[in-house]
């Protein structure tokens, strides 16, 4: 089994080659040609291969072990790939430099809608990406239930730059396991709608909730889906109006689109990448060292004991929207080659080896 789950039995090029070899001089009927096009497109979007199930993946991880050695060469190669495909240093967020007045951009999650940068949106962007690059030691914290009773909070807080996903709870009951430090926190517009009623009725609950993130950047995909633009702008104006410590950054749709294409070319086929994979991808392009926590999308832990889906609840995601096992296998591969470190064991039992 490939460690990344990338083996395919069919590809569009391979299928074309077979047709050309079997029928070198035959012209297919119009209906048959159209059917071939449909089949080849389907195979490209949904390649035929069997992904290992949860039990097989967990057993594979247990067999390989989690001991780790940093490989600066592997990390450097992957950082260069990120720079070449997606340019996170310049395109991670919307800025006055990459989104000037009058520029038209397409929503990355929709095919039919574009938007033009006008004065009202341009004024919300920073001049440039507001980080001192490269960032040194970064921690990307997912929300997996494997973090519960992990004791990883102290280790997470030792990072120079901490990224978190989807406005997670950081109250005192969780800090021992997930830490309290944050520098960048993502917020999907769907969360603003579900938890805070799109900020249409009361803003106080939202403002109070945000205080736990201190001086963090709040990273929002305002221009990913058209329905997400208005809630994202409300978040910006709400925090600005009350003089909150947080600063809103809007994801550049060109960056999100490029990250999606990058991982699709490596075998991840889903309606949408998870927020966690977007963040890890950005970190690999922005940071010298990357450690990830809570990236374990399975129902049992490393001892094959049942765990909750998140460290704070057991609410399951919508089925089929993300390809979490495929994403995990890609990240596990990066861990095994030393490009990043994936923390799966309790932190007090951490087994690290020197840099190579």
Curated annotation (Swiss-Prot):
* Glycosylated residues (UniProt): 71, 119, 214, 245
| UniProt keywords, alphabetically | Disulfide bond, Glycoprotein, Glycosyltransferase, Golgi apparatus, Lipid biosynthesis, Lipid metabolism, Membrane, Signal-anchor, Sphingolipid metabolism, Transferase, Transmembrane, Transmembrane helix
GO cellular component terms listed in the entry, alphabetical order: Golgi membrane
Membrane topology designation: Single-pass type II membrane protein
A Pfam family per the record: Glyco_transf_29
Binding-site positions, CMP-N-acetyl-beta-neuraminate: 143, 166, 274-276, 296, 310
Concerning InterPro entries, the annotation shows: Glyco_trans_29, Glycosyltr_29_Sialyltrsf, GT29-like_sf, Sialyl_trans
Q: In which pathway does it act?
A: Protein modification; protein glycosylation; Lipid metabolism; sphingolipid metabolism
Which Enzyme Commission number(s) are on file for it? 2.4.3.8
Subcellular location(s) of the protein:
Golgi apparatus membrane
The record ties this protein, via Gene3D superfamilies, to: Glycosyl transferase family 29
Q: Which GO terms describe its biological process?
A: N-glycan processing; oligosaccharide metabolic process; protein glycosylation; sphingolipid metabolic process
Q: Does the keyword Lipid metabolism apply?
A: yes
Membrane-spanning regions, if any?
30-48
Q: Which CDD domains match?
A: GT29_ST8SIA1
A Gene Ontology molecular function term for this protein is: alpha-N-acetylneuraminate alpha-2,8-sialyltransferase activity
Q: Does the keyword Glycoprotein apply?
A: yes
The record places the following residue ranges in the Cytoplasmic compartment, namely 1-29
Topological domain ranges for the Lumenal compartment: 49-356
Where in the chain are disulfide-linked cysteines found? 138-287
Catalytic reaction equation(s): an N-acetyl-alpha-neuraminyl-(2->3)-beta-D-galactosyl derivative + CMP-N-acetyl-beta-neuraminate = an N-acetyl-alpha-neuraminyl-(2->8)-N-acetyl-alpha-neuraminyl-(2->3)-beta-D-galactosyl derivative + CMP + H(+); a ganglioside GM3 (d18:1(4E)) + CMP-N-acetyl-beta-neuraminate = a ganglioside GD3 (d18:1(4E)) + CMP + H(+); a ganglioside GD3 (d18:1(4E)) + CMP-N-acetyl-beta-neuraminate = a ganglioside GT3 (d18:1(4E)) + CMP + H(+); a ganglioside GD1a (d18:1(4E)) + CMP-N-acetyl-beta-neuraminate = a ganglioside GT1a (d18:1(4E)) + CMP + H(+)
Question: Which family is it part of?
Answer: Belongs to the glycosyltransferase 29 family.
Function, please?
Catalyzes the addition of sialic acid in alpha 2,8-linkage to the sialic acid moiety of the ganglioside GM3 to form ganglioside GD3; gangliosides are a subfamily of complex glycosphingolipds that contain one or more residues of sialic acid. Can catalyze the addition of a second alpha-2,8- sialic acid to GD3 to form GT3. Can use GM1b, GD1a and GT1b as acceptor substrates to synthesize GD1c, GT1a and GQ1b respectively.
Protein name as catalogued: Alpha-N-acetylneuraminide alpha-2,8-sialyltransferase
Source organism: Bos taurus (Bovine)
């Amino acid at each position: 089994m490939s460690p990344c789950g990338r083996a395919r039995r069919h590809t569009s090029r391979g299928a074309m080659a077979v047709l050309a070899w079997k029928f070198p001089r035959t012209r297919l009927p119009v209906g048959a040609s159209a059917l071939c096009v449909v089949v080849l497109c389907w195979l490209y979007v949904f390649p035929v291969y069997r992904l290992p199930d949860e039990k097989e993946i967990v057993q594979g991880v247990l067999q390989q072990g989690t001991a780790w050695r940093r490989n600066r060469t592997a990390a450097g190669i992957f950082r260069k790939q990120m720079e070449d495909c997606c340019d996170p240093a310049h395109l991670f967020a919307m800025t006055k430099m990459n989104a000037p007045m009058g520029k038209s951009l397409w929503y990355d999650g929709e095919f039919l809608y574009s938007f033009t940068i006008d004065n009202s949106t341009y004024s919300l962007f920073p001049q440039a990406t507001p980080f001192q690059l490269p960032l040194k030691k970064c921690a990307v914290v997912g929300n997996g239930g494997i973090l519960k009773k992990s004791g990883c909070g102290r280790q997470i807080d030792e990072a120079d730059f901490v990224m978190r996903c989807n406005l997670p709870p950081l109250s005192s009951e969780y800090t021992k396991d997930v830490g309290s430090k944050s520098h960048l926190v993502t917020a999907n517009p769907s969360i603003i709608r579900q938890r805070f009623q799109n900020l249409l009725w009361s803003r106080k609950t939202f403002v109070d909730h945000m205080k736990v993130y201190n001086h963090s950047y709040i990273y929002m995909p305002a221009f990913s889906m058209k329905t997400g633009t208005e809630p994202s702008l409300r978040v910006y104006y709400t925090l600005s109006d009350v003089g909150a410590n947080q600063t809103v950054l809007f994801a550049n749709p060109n960056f999100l689109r490029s990250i999606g294409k990058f991982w699709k070319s490596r075998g991840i086929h889903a309606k949408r990448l998870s927020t966690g994979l977007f963040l890890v991808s950005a970190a690999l392009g922005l940071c010298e060292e990357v450690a990830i926590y809570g990236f374990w999308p399975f129902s049992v832990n490393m001892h094959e004991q049942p765990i909750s889906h998140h460290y704070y609840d057991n609410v399951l995601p919508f089925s089929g929207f993300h390809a979490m096992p495929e994403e995990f296998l890609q990240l596990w591969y990066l861990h095994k080659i030393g490009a990043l470190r994936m923390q799966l064991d309790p932190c007090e039992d951490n087994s690290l080896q020197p840099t190579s």
